[in-house]
Regions:
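Conserved P-loop NTP-binding catalytic core
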Residues: 64, 69-70, 74, 83-130
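Pre-Walker A-like glycine/lysine-rich segment at the N-terminus of P-loop NTPase domains
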Residues: 17-87
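Short, positively charged and aromatic/hydrophobic N-terminal segments
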Residues: 1-2, 6, 11-17, 21
Length: 130
């Protein structure tokens, strides 16, 4: 498991100690109206109810999360665009909105030009869900 020492959100920094209860982990990431994503799509790290391989699951009193996920899919199914959405959201948090961001909407629906792109990030940090 990778332990994060600090998380930077623009001018805010969360320092995380390397204790089990102070681990920072992604819970889920959602995106809509961005590149090939028209409707909201969610990448989730929430663990299922399987009882096998429990060493691959991080759990505390609030939630159970998988420690690792794999993105699989056919060619042109949106894998690279999901990674681009992660990178875009990160750059907005750290650096603010970049120039030219308005042309990244889902172009197959002409109405989406006036609809905002949406990103939702849910994190577990210091035993709290943000």
């Amino acid at each position: 498991m990778i332990l994060i020492d600090k998380i930077v959100f623009g001018k805010y920094t969360i320092v995380v100690r390397n204790k089990r209860e102070d681990i920072a982990m992604l819970i889920q990431f959602s995106v809509s109206n961005f590149l090939s994503f028209n409707e909201q799509e969610t990448f989730s790290m929430i663990a299922g109810k399987a009882r096998k391989n429990i060493d691959r699951v991080f759990s505390n009193k609030k939630i159970k999360l998988t420690k690792c996920e794999v993105i699989l899919g056919a060619n042109a199914s949106g894998k690279s665009n999901l990674v681009s959405a992660f990178q875009f959201a990160q750059s907005v948090i750290v650096d603010g909105l970049p120039r030219g961001f308005s042309n990244k909407f889902f172009r197959l629906n002409p109405e989406n030009k006036t609809v905002p792109s949406e990103f939702e990030i849910e994190l577990l940090c210091c035993s709290k869900i943000f």
